[in-house]
């Protein structure tokens, strides 16, 4: 009996020790909450984010709603991250307003928030004054990316020996938001600068349109009537309207040289055509989604390590018929 009592006492003591031992801390985590998840763009962002986490010993989770209208769903994702004791930082791009409470909670819990891609909806309208948890933005520098298009397109025009005073370049700007303005201005400023260095004065006409069906086709037609010799398109939406017109009216547009922005199936088909059946798409700039994901997580980690942080602008990647498949394999260029 005494032996049994002794055994029971030992078991009770062991149980007490186990109960008093604090739960083992889980893996330190950075939660990435995007505007989507399944699209190739977001998958490339995810790959970059996970890689940055692995390099620094952090687990990276990645979530996004199935559509950009599911604000409540995305709010739940943010709330779940905030309630997870292992989450040390959040990387966030919101699809609408309604995140006031979540951002305030992040501030109060001292969880830094990195904005990425388009950042917080409506330029951070949900941030409460004095309770801002955001530490920086990682996104495409649209002006820099527009300038990258200009540098490469100008080099092509110069190599083809087609540049003369008064050479006509049209620009189809996709809307009047900062994105459209910066992509157009970056291109125009840089290509004028390069031309001036060669003592050439270009004639540039800007067609500024909204994202309404048919408007980009009208802009294309207007630039053709004006006598455009080259045309720059500021996003995938413009390309998706222009390409079918260029294919259907080969003779009307065959002599015009094109350059663009973003990715997508139409740009892939057009650029791979190489001018064989319709006007030539010389090249375009893709947003470097992999690097956006990578640098976003790196920024969060730097803050957690007590380092000074600042916004990171990503310039994009120029692609042509020659390197488009390589960028596709690296998840920089995406279809869809």
Regions found by a protein language model. Name each.
Residues 1-29, 54-55, 59, 82, ...:
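Short, low-complexity disordered leader/linker segments with a strong preference
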Residues 29-53, 61-79, 94-97, 172-182, ...:
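Extracytoplasmic "Venus flytrap"
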Residues 74, 136-167, 215-216, 263-268, ...:
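Hydrophobic alpha-helical segments within soluble ligand-binding/sensing domains
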Residues 54-67, 193-213:
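Short beta-strand elements in bilobed, periplasmic/extracellular small-molecule ligand-binding domains
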Residues 102-144, 264-278:
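Flexible loop/hinge segments that line or gate small-molecule binding clefts
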Residues 41-56, 145-149, 179-199, 241:
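Short, solvent-exposed amphipathic alpha-helices that sit
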Residues 171-172, 288-336:
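Hinge/cleft segment of the Venus flytrap/periplasmic-binding protein
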Residues 79, 89-113, 187, 208-270:
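Hydrophobic alpha-helical
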């Amino acid at each position: 009996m005494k032996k049994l009592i002794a055994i029971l006492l030992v078991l009770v003591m062991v149980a007490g020790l186990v109960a008093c031992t604090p739960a083992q801390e889980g893996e330190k985590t950075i939660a990435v909450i995007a505007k989507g998840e399944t699209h190739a763009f977001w998958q490339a962002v995810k790959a970059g984010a996970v890689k940055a986490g692995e390099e620094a010993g952090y687990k990276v989770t990645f979530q996004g709603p199935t559509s950009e209208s599911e604000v409540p769903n995305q709010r739940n994702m943010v709330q779940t991250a905030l309630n997870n004791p292992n989450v040390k930082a959040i990387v966030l791009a919101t699809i609408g307003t309604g995140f006031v409470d979540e951002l305030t909670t992040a501030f109060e819990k001292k969880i830094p928030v990195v904005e990425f891609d388009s950042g917080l909806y409506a330029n951070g309208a949900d941030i409460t004054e004095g309770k801002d948890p955001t530490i920086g933005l990682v996104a495409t520098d649209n002006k820099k990316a527009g300038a990258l298009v200009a540098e490469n397109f100008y080099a092509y025009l110069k190599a083809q020996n087609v540049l003369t005073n008064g050479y006509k370049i049209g620009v189809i700007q996709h809307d009047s938001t900062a994105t459209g303005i910066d992509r157009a201005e970056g291109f125009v400023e840089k290509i004028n600068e390069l031309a001036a260095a060669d003592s050439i004065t270009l004639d540039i006409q800007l067609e500024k349109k909204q994202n309404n069906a048919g408007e980009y086709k009208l802009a294309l037609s207007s630039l053709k009537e004006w006598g455009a010799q080259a045309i720059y398109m500021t996003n995938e939406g413009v390309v998706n309207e222009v390409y079918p017109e260029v294919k259907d009216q080969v003779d009307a547009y065959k002599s015009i040289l094109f350059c663009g922005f973003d990715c997508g199936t139409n740009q892939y088909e057009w650029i791979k055509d190489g001018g064989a059946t319709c006007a030539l798409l010389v090249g375009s700039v893709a947003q470097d989604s992999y690097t956006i994901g990578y640098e976003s997580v790196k920024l969060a980690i730097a803050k957690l390590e007590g380092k000074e942080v600042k916004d990171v602008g990503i310039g994009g990647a120029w692609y042509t018929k020659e390197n488009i498949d390589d960028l596709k394999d690296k998840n920089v260029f995406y279809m869809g």
